[in-house]
Curated annotation (Swiss-Prot):
One of its GO terms (molecular function) is structural constituent of chromatin. It comes from Nitrosomonas eutropha (strain DSM 101675 / C91 / Nm57). The keyword S-adenosyl-L-methionine does not apply. Pfam families: Bac_DNA_binding (PF00216). This is Integration host factor subunit beta. It comes from the Bacteria. Keywords: DNA recombination, DNA-binding, Transcription, Transcription regulation, Translation regulation. The keyword NAD does not apply. Heterodimer of an alpha and a beta chain. Gene3D superfamilies: IHF-like DNA-binding proteins (4.10.520.10). NCBIfam families: hip (TIGR00988), PRK00199.1 (NF001222). GO terms for biological process: DNA recombination; regulation of DNA-templated transcription; regulation of translation. Belongs to the bacterial histone-like protein family. GO terms for cellular component: chromosome; cytosol.
Length: 105
């Protein structure tokens, strides 16, 4: 799902919202989440999942074209962990999909 699709679904679900208002709501939420992560804060949305930062130490990597060794500096990367309800929903959905594939396969 893209940001545009999310905005469209929000506008469909809430007809009283104009498309530009739905777009603004999505933008405000995503900006707030990005700023929170940039401050090093953890984001938890119960039933959906949590976002936090993982530390990656510096290391020696390789340039894929030349094979030359390259220093890769330390960094923090965003990490998402799905909540229990989401994991269960995804798992049951894929199990049903696999059963349908086997039945028609």
């Amino acid at each position: 799902m893209t940001k545009s699709e999310l905005i469209s679904k929000l506008a469909e679900r809430f007809p009283q919202l104009l498309a530009k208002d739905a777009e603004l709501v999505v933008k405000i939420i995503l900006d707030a989440m990005a700023k929170s992560l940039a401050r090093g804060e953890r984001i938890e949305i119960r039933g959906f999942g949590s976002f936090d930062l993982n530390y990656r130490p510096s290391r020696v990597g390789r340039n894929p074209k030349s094979g030359e060794k390259v220093h890769v500096p330390e960094k923090y990367v965003p990490h998402f962990k799905a909540g229990k309800k989401m994991r269960e929903l995804i798992d049951s959905s894929h199990k049903q999909h696999n059963l349908l594939d086997q039945a028609t396969g």
